[in-house]
Regions:
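Sec-exported extracytoplasmic/periplasmic mature domains
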Residues: 26-30, 51, 55, 140-144, ...
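Short hydrophobic segments within beta-strands
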Residues: 35-37, 125-126, 154
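Short acidic, S/G/P-rich loop/turn micro-motifs used as interaction or catalytic elements
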Residues: 40-43, 129-133
Length: 264
């Protein structure tokens, strides 16, 4: 964004999220990660965040959100048709063989959907809501299971509908600290008899930051205040400040067996 010098942009941006995902990838010694981005208006922001976070991506793909196009694209990404043909070929080979345990092998093969692995350990999906569920469902259709590959998404704001989707679990995503969020919501509700939206949540800390800076600095050129590396601890979370950028230090969560768990 080309913002004036006296304007600050803050929030849970793509770079903040990828910094957290990068930490998770390192902790789990994940070697090959593919990145799936929908063909939407934030595509360029994602590309920039990948560069800024220096996260290692094996391959990047842009996909269409229209269901039939999406499924075909996921099939191509996962080499589904080749892996499906491998299974058909193996079934035919065993059927025509004289193996002693022929029936047992056939029984096992008929329970499978494909033969052959995919060339990645984890998938990052920069999507949300029903569109996200469609992508993961397409991965399941192509025999890529969250139980065998890490499925990582962007901040889902603790979407409770994901807890009910057993087939797409486990999944992982970065977000703000849930306890801090709940404390803020309760405080806000007591004061205003309503629950806050996410804009008010993020503004809560940012307004405090600007007030603090205004006490000791000239705000005619705000960008000068953010060139040195620094951190600001607010009520909601911690913000890292450096090179005129504000990044939110996030937690990482897992949804598995219909439960939410904080990983770090």
């Amino acid at each position: 964004l080309n913002l004036p010098n006296n304007v600050i942009s803050g929030g849970i941006n793509a770079t903040s999220q990828l910094n957290t995902i990068k930490k998770f990838i390192k902790l789990n010694k994940i070697k090959k990660t593919i990145f799936l981005t929908p063909r939407l208006d934030y595509e360029d922001e994602i590309k920039k965040a990948i560069s800024q976070s220096k996260i290692k991506i094996y391959k990047q793909y842009i996909y269409d959100t229209e269901p039939t196009k999406l499924t075909a694209q996921i099939e191509k990404i996962t080499n589904y048709k080749i892996r499906k043909q491998n299974l058909l070929d193996e079934l035919k080979r065993v059927e025509n063989s004289d193996l002693i345990d022929k029936e047992k092998q056939l029984e096992k093969l008929k329970k499978r959907y494909t033969i052959g692995n995919v060339n990645f350990d984890s998938v990052i999906i920069a999507d949300f809501d029903e569109s996200l569920k469609s992508v993961i469902t397409s991965l399941l259709y192509t025999d890529v299971s969250p139980k065998k590959k890490f499925i990582i998404t962007f901040n889902q704001w603790f979407d409770e509908s994901l807890l009910k989707e057993k087939t797409i679990q486990p999944i992982y995503y970065p977000s703000i600290n849930k306890k801090n969020l709940e404390n803020f919501e309760n405080k806000f509700n007591k004061e205003f008899d309503a629950y806050p939206n996410y804009l008010s949540l993020l503004s809560y800390d940012l307004v405090g930051l600007i007030y603090y800076l205004s006490l000791n600095n000239d705000l005619t050129d705000v960008s000068k205040l953010f060139r040195k590396k620094n951190s600001f601890k607010g009520k909601i979370g911690i913000f890292d400040i450096e090179n005129n950028k504000i990044n939110h230090k996030l937690n990482l969560y897992q949804i598995d067996k219909e439960k939410l768990k904080e990983i770090f």
